[in-house]
Amino acid sequence: DSTAPVPVLKILRSEETPGAAAHIAMGLNSLGLSVSLHCCVGDDREGKVIIEKLSDDGIDTSGVGVVPGRNTLTKIRFYGSRESLLDKSQILLQADRGPGEELTEGISASLTASAMSSLSDSCAIVLSDYDKGVLTTEGALSLIKAAGDAGIPVIMDPKLTGLEKSRGADAVLFEIRGLGLLQRRLMASDQAEAAKNLIETYEWGAMLVLGGVHGVTLYQADGETMHLPCSAV
């Protein structure tokens, strides 16, 4: 119905926060860790804002590539609330803008080489796959192998559709609903069996399952399982 009413939002304030790999880098930096970030942004306003905010936090951005003609992945979220309940807002709408295609072979190889150059000074590698064409299978597996040869642990947050990229990682992160979905696909009797199957298939050292209010569960390649419940702070 072309005459149907549409929501009209009054914008009271707005803020810009780096997400994805930049968010992880800022989180690690806030813990006092020295971070070497390797990713890419587009040659647009959003890309410039991300680099500026990272630099303002003291994070080295020399490994952040700017790709001409590419849009920076941007998520615009609109929150709303009643005037009497301003402290209880909820998301009304999310609009996404950004690339879905993989980087060109040359840019991808350059990004991988940039990350490789930081291995010798690293105590751990964190790979986070957002399925937006930046972390390729070849690049991820090359980094995992090089880190393994150097005795550097690799922690990875994989996409369910790209688990092959995480083969050989020391630890992978999963949301509990993601493991539940894979449990059904694998026709496993429970999540523990699904975790064991996945760990063996992809040669992971461990799988950490994030269960929200239920805490976290660590499944290890040696069969050991550890559960840590949430605690009130």
Task: Describe each PLM feature range.
Residues 132-226:
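Conserved phosphate/ATP/ADP-binding segment of small-molecule kinases
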Residues 53-69:
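A glycine-rich helix N-cap at a beta->alpha junction
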Residues 66-70, 75-118:
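Conserved phosphate-binding/catalytic loop of the ribokinase/pfkB sugar-kinase fold
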Residues 41-57:
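A glycine-rich beta-to-alpha transition motif near the start of alpha/beta enzyme domains, typified by
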Residues 1-36, 228-233:
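Glycine-rich phosphate/adenosyl-contacting loop at the front of the ribokinase-like
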Residues 119-134:
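Short acidic, glycine-rich surface-loop motifs adjacent to enzyme active sites
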Residues 1-9, 85-101, 123, 174-181:
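Gly-rich Lys/Arg/Thr-decorated short loops/hinges at beta-loop-alpha junctions or inter-strand turns
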